[in-house]
């Protein structure tokens, strides 16, 4: 009789079997895939020996889908059907994208995520990104000789729920099991921390093709803690290309070039940028579709001057991230550069000037994110003990819910470490209330009108009882990928409801930055507004309770003079509550409470007498 192999619950039946897992850097300009071999993280190469896969997808006339270099070669000839930098559009609406005049695509403005019209039909950024992921998966499985267990895919630190979910959806379409989404700066920290055994405060300066992220990290004995993050999701190496592109238009007096010429000039701009990394001048020679020739020379000094405003833009998020972490420049031990754009000399010089020290460039800035993701994937696949490395990401904006008076009660504050779960108890406002609307919000302001709505759901089945008697526990959970779920449960009946927040499309980096800035600017005004609304809510609650008490017991327990005085004080509170003075409202509430103390005592006595009526000492449960 054959023996049945068993194992402890939760353990593999083959605990020492190496599982094939990879780290994927799904980049705006280029994408990579890496894995851990013999304890070392290495990037997997294609058949031509190249590590980078251009994040470009071409929909050919014969129905074939080309990805990478093959697609890139079609950009000049067929720009409308060759989609580059689709990552910029993940989880975004057309209004979020901003200036599209330089893009040759036919955008379809539909509710939710923007779509792009191609000869293969209307394609979403999710579908386009899935083609890139399919290509990386095929490369990995061919190189590793087997089927992947899963992958860790990196995303910019400031990707919100919609953008992260869109990334997961793209992976699902590509047939990839996502072990985890990992912030790109955190992935870089993993790679550098393990290679160099670094400890202390580090800044990860990540300037990719389309996004800029900065993270402040504390590295201590294998623990990577993200203290704060900031950035700009509409700033990257592509913007440096566009500065050269617009410079060419100015020099040649070209106006509104057609899509093919736009692609030719953008390609020439990118090549000039890369040439200037190693040389002091670059020649730009392009023959346009009308036969006209562009022949210009751009010096490194001119290029630095053109792009100085872009460099200055990267310093603003750095200052904000340092302030959020309560750190100064002097406390930073090192700066890690990530992203191909950081090869530009003016970028390295700007970073060195700001921090007063040269940045670290030990690892290839194009590969470092994928290398770190591969290390994390190896751990999550069970190939290493997960106690060897602990990383802690943070959420960029506070999460909370609406309370009476349009106020926001923050449940999870911004920069909280992920994953995280927080619970808080709430109660009903009215007598006999059997349902409660839960409104989930994101932002730093005190009033609902100034924050972003993430979703709503209703909790029904609350047992009818006096206002304030019910206990509803609301739990916020944010997983390691930054996705939020909210649940509410009434403690006595067990009534339960929940929501998983997947917004139709997300916030841009600029909007997030503006929300944070507005919270700082309006802090004092928000404080007064909250105090006023809290006072008004207290007043309304007291007035409603007194009206019910007077209807029930006023005639029995009060004489005419007492009732008139209470009514006068109630009317005074109603009038004061219409004004903008929270102190005056609180004083009126205190005065009304004082005026009704005798009435409250009589009601309590009457309730006790009623409860004891017909009872003897022997029948009481004492």
UniProtKB/Swiss-Prot annotation:
Q: Which InterPro entries does this entry report, sorted A to Z?
A: ATPase_NBD, Heat_shock_70_CS, HscA_NBD, HSP70_C_sf, HSP70_peptide-bd_sf, Hsp_70_fam, ISC_FeS_clus_asmbl_HscA
Q: Name one GO molecular function term.
A: unfolded protein binding
Q: Which Gene3D superfamilies does UniProt cross-reference here?
A: 1.20.1270.10, 3.30.420.40, Actin, Chain A, domain 4, Substrate Binding Domain Of DNAk, Chain A, domain 1
Record's keyword annotation contains Nucleotide-binding: yes
One GO biological process term: iron-sulfur cluster assembly
Superkingdom as given in the UniProt entry:
Bacteria
**CDD domains from the UniProt entry:** ASKHA_NBD_HSP70_HscA (cd10236)
What keywords appear on the UniProt entry? ATP-binding, Chaperone, Nucleotide-binding
The record ties this protein, via Pfam families, to: HSP70
Q: What is this protein's function?
A: Chaperone involved in the maturation of iron-sulfur cluster-containing proteins. Has a low intrinsic ATPase activity which is markedly stimulated by HscB.
Family assignment? Belongs to the heat shock protein 70 family.
Q: What is this protein called?
A: Chaperone protein HscA homolog
Instruction: Name the species this protein comes from.
Output: Methylobacillus flagellatus (strain ATCC 51484 / DSM 6875 / VKM B-1610 / KT)
Query: Lineage from the top down?
Result: Bacteria, Pseudomonadati, Pseudomonadota, Betaproteobacteria, Nitrosomonadales
